Amino acid sequence: MCIRDRILVVNTASYCGFTKQYDELQELWDLYKEKGLIVLGVPSNSFNQEKKINSEIKNFCEVNFNINFPLTTITEVKGENAHEIFKWAKENHGKSAVPKWNFHKILINKEGKVEDTYASFTKPMSKKIINRLENIL
């Protein structure tokens, strides 16, 4: 599979200690969208910390974090009911691709392969993520 852009898939939640990472996700999007990075927020209640209505999530993100990167609808990210992208990531990259908590990050390169995964505590603007992005953009 070949895709034009690189994608950072992040499972998000409104009521999590990591929710403040929305700020850095927006910063990352602003810095790299013209270079071919898509930041894709995937709201999920898999860890029971997300609102129940998609429009409320969108409003929360816009009002509190002024985000304008794409958000999906509420999606399961683990287990049997996980969305296909998370099942695919697990099959192609192993257990490290399975979110263990909110704000888990999966970086997909332009060849459509999992480039790397990052745990919740890895901030979007961390050197670890920035260095990897700089190498693949």
Residue ranges and their predicted role:
Residues G36-I38, Q49-N59:
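Short, surface-exposed acidic-centric catalytic microdomains
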Residues Q21-E24, I53, I57, N81, ...:
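Stable alpha-helical elements in mature extracytoplasmic
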Residues K87, E91-L137:
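Thiol-/selenol-based redox modules, centered on thioredoxin-like
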Residues S14-C16, P43-Q49, T75-K78, S120:
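Short histidine/acidic/glycine/proline-rich micro-motifs that form metal-
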Residues S55-N102:
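Short, internal strand/loop/helix patches
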Residues R6, Y15, T19-P43, E62-F65:
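Conserved helix-turn-beta segment immediately C-terminal to the redox Cys motif
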Residues M1-D5:
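Conserved small/polar residues in nucleotide/adenosyl-binding loops
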